[in-house]
Swiss-Prot record:
Belongs to the GcvH family. Keywords: Lipoyl, Mitochondrion, Transit peptide. One of its GO terms (biological process) is glycine decarboxylation via glycine cleavage system. The glycine cleavage system is composed of four proteins: P (GLDC), T (GCST), L (DLD) and H (GCSH). Interacts with GLDC. It comes from Mus musculus. Transmembrane segments: none annotated. Its main location: mitochondrion. This is Glycine cleavage system H protein, mitochondrial. HAMAP family: GcvH.
Amino acid sequence: MSLQVSRSLRVVAYSLRTALTFCSPRPCVPSAAAVRSLRTGSALLSVRKFTEKHEWITTEEGIGTVGISNFAQEALGDVVYCSLPEVGTKLKKQEEFGALESVKAASELYSPLSGEVTEVNEALAENPGLVNKSCYEDGWLIKMTLSDPSEMDELMSEEAYEKYVKSIEE
């Protein structure tokens, strides 16, 4: 019995020595790539802001990415056409910037913030159904610079938006 305990202790001691030799005495600092991947993971929803007209926006380094909410895409049904602005278009908060058409309805799109369009999701021209398949990732609509980033404070958090949707469904 004592022989088994002795062997077990030697194995544990060896494991600890091996583990400690691989530990760096410097503090662990995540790389920029690791931080970027964390930001684009599940935490992304916590920084997404919503409008009462069901658009969402996320920002990174002064550029906003705009799309429609899951609630909106479900209400629309299968999106068959997207009308989006040209790059360089200047938008004011709540200004109409395009439209989505589905088999059962059409819906105007409104800018959640003031700014200038820097990119349009060209993939939607050939595959507008991306809005339905991936409204928060591949189905984004436009990217824009922000004229007044403080306007973000006036938008709803994900939690507030969920409460808002529940209130209008009742």
